[in-house]
Amino acid sequence: MPLEMDQKVNKLTFGCQRSSTSDDDSGCAMEEYTWVPPGLRLEQVQLYFACLPEEKIPYVNSVGEKYRIKQLLYQLPPHDNEVRYCQSLSEEEKKELQMFSAQRKKEALGRGNIKMLSRAVMHATCEKCGEKINGGEVAIFVSRAGPGVCWHPSCFVCSTCNELLVDLIYFYQDGKIHCGRHHAELLKPRCSACDEIIFADECTEAEGRHWHMNHFCCYECETVLGGQRYIMKDGRPFCCGCFESHYAEYCESCGEHIGVDHAQMTYDGQHWHATETCFSCAQCKVSLLGCPFLPKKGRIYCCKACSLGEDVHASDSSDSAFQSARSRESRRSVRMGKSSRSADQCRQSLLLSPAVNYKFPGMFGNADDTLSRKMDDLSMSRQGAGFDNDTWKARDEQETAEDHEEWAEHDDYMTQLLLKFGEKGLFQQPPEDNRSNDHWMSENIKGKNDLQRNNRNQSLASKKYQSDMYWAQSQDGLGDSAYGSHPGPASSRKLQELDMDHGASGYMHEKMPWYKRSLECLSNNLKPQNENICDSMDSLALSNITGASVDAESKSRPSLFSYQNFQELNTRDFDKMSNMGTLNSSMLNRSTESLKSLNSEICQEKPPPEEKPMHTSALKRSKSQTRPQVKFSDDVIDNGDYSSIEIRRPPMSERSRRRVYNSEEQSQRPHHHHHHRRRKSRKSRSENALHLATDSKSSGKERKRSYTAEDYERLFHNKSAHEVQAYIQNADLFGQYSNAASNVGLPSQVVDKFLGLYGEDEDSWCSTCSSSSSDSEEEGYFLGQPIPKPRPQRYQYFSDDLCSPTNALSSSQFSQRTSKSKKKKGHKGKNCIIS
């Protein structure tokens, strides 16, 4: 035999000897492996290990060797089989452990057999993966599963942990193979603390695992947690104290520990207390609990503006005190169809333009418009009775010491207006030569002060109107209760001064005849008189702010207008103002007579006495005007007793018919000289401005008297020079009346027809005593012209001083308004209230 052949045989023989198995359980027949499957030849061993991952092959001094040792301890724990490895078993438990181990070995323990499939085998399938095992390949068979069941070497794993069964040792249970650990757990619970099988009757179960009763304790301090609060961390129980000291998070907002008793918010590794204070916007501190947020540079924000560092609460408005109220009113204005012009734009454009009339931006005080000025003063009238100047003079002396520019030092817009146009600006009489320097207050306002100073009985509404007329309009005409609780300083002063004026005596006039006055006073006083045409609008807004009704019984309200601006107002301005003031405020505030007529069966008012003194307190007269839905702050509240009066707001279906209802009621009841007499409703106030009529006030005991020139001379003959001073500011109203009446020359029949649109009964409107007169109705002559008698059942309009009908409108303009007024009889025009 050749030498080479001998070497090959010797090599093969040597290899077979190394591959032979020994009788011990080591299974390490080959030197290069720490363990080899028993009973296999070398080529079969090499084929088997070739099917396993390289890191799991148990080479000597390799990673596979360490892996095998680890798996032996894990899959085949010694304390599951041997009592000597257990720590704290009772005698009974030890016996039970021995029985348990013997039963498992007998019923489930086995070792897999490695076989090379014959090439004739064509249909072998892996039990794990279900793939086909071809002939000539190595497969593992399990005797407890049956002869035909086999696995790939890499698929022979525990059904629970999917780890390779170490040394091919398995436990068969219910058609599946398991490692020793998980097979034992199928039969008995294992303690998560000591890793031993629990043979006791009681155990603790938590988080899906089990413990011996005395083994369920804190992982750090070993405090028994049975029945106590605990926190699981990485599969280990901790008491609350140990958990907070080792694992508690810090709040990103306050920097404190987030205790186990506090809920926390976690985002991107950051933690916050789940409170409105901590989990809030880093800029504006708005709570973000339950809200989306914007994370930026480790901080959270509520919006993009805050993340950029902007102050979302900053206001660029000059009256930030009314921001919330204006927002409520703006939402209301969308429904009411109000002008979309902002309040800031309105105030800035009006205050910074002295030539523009504040109340009506569309009306300008043009000095060249002589016809407009004459028409304005023809509508303007005065009354011969009013307050004494002593009360106002004492108050003016106290306030003149105030700095003239004090209003400019205040940032708040309302404070500026009240300082500039309050009592100081409205009631103080500056010298004639200084009028040209007062650009902030029009001379029309000063004329209005003279007119209101002549009232014999100042009421709550009239006193508040004097100091607050800019206050009402500065809210952009908002005639709603959004500002009803504004505690303005001017309004509080007026309420405190109510009872100071009710006993004042009337004016005495100079003996100088009215027709001897120069025309210079006329030019000084005629400047912007046209603004008062919108007083009915402002009174509606003001009544909601101050809570007092500003009606014809409360103060003199002359409606001044210019002939050229009337059509512009009729087509444009009143469409805006009526929606804004009249419609809104009329629904909120009802006149006394309307409430009485609509609620005659429900609200029984105590009838006032037949004759009231001329100095009756304004608060007593305003009791019927009190509306419970308007709320006031403490500094403007009147502590009078109003509990005896019950007022119910009528339903909407009754509101639009209140004048017709009143007309029927007035026609049925006798005409008494009531002090609490019928008032003009807010609706008539709006139409008064629309129809170019003035709220002329007659004196308390006179009604439809006619006067001649001799009567006026006798009137002024009895007046003192000091008390006629009020008429100086208005420059010969009587002369204006005479001239304009003769120049314009309106037909008296048209006047009666126009004035008749407003009358439902024979009661006239009185500004002072508020009583209807039944004195003589004889015919008279005014400057040689006969005064026509009015039709019955109609109101007659009188000037404040002359107490004679005002016939001061052009016939063309008047006939145009008369035709429009006929269509609007019943108050269904576009500027009327539509419920």
Swiss-Prot record:
Expressed in the dorsal marginal zone of early gastrulae (stage 10). As gastrulation proceeds, expression expands to include the lateral and ventral marginal zones, excluding the few rows of cells above the blastopore lip. Expression moves dorsally with gastrulation cell movements, and by the end of gastrulation expression is seen in dorsal mesoderm and posterior but not anterior neural ectoderm. Expression becomes down-regulated in mesoderm but remains strong in posterior ectoderm through the neurula stages. Residues 432-453, 603-614, 646-655 have a biased composition (Basic and acidic residues). Residues 124-188, 189-249, 250-313 form the LIM zinc-binding domain. It holds the Pfam family PET. Residues 669-683, 819-835 have a biased composition (Basic residues). It is a peripheral membrane protein. A lipid is attached at residue 832 (S-farnesyl cysteine). GO terms for biological process: anterior/posterior axis specification; convergent extension involved in gastrulation; establishment of planar polarity. Keywords: Cell membrane, Developmental protein, Gastrulation, LIM domain, Lipoprotein, Membrane, Metal-binding, Methylation, Prenylation, Repeat, Zinc. The modification Cysteine methyl ester is found at residue 832. It comes from the Eukaryota. It is found in: Cell membrane. PANTHER family: LIM DOMAIN-CONTAINING PROTEIN (PTHR24211), PRICKLE-LIKE PROTEIN 1 (PTHR24211:SF15). Interacts with dvl2/dsh and mapk8/jnk1. Belongs to the prickle / espinas / testin family. Acts in a planar cell polarity (PCP) complex; polarization along the apical/basal axis of epithelial cells. Regulates the polarized assembly of fibronectrin on the surface of the mesoderm during gastrulation. Essential for gastrulation cell movements, cooperating with dvl2/dsh to activate jnk. Acts together with tes to control axial elongation. This is Prickle-like protein 1-A.
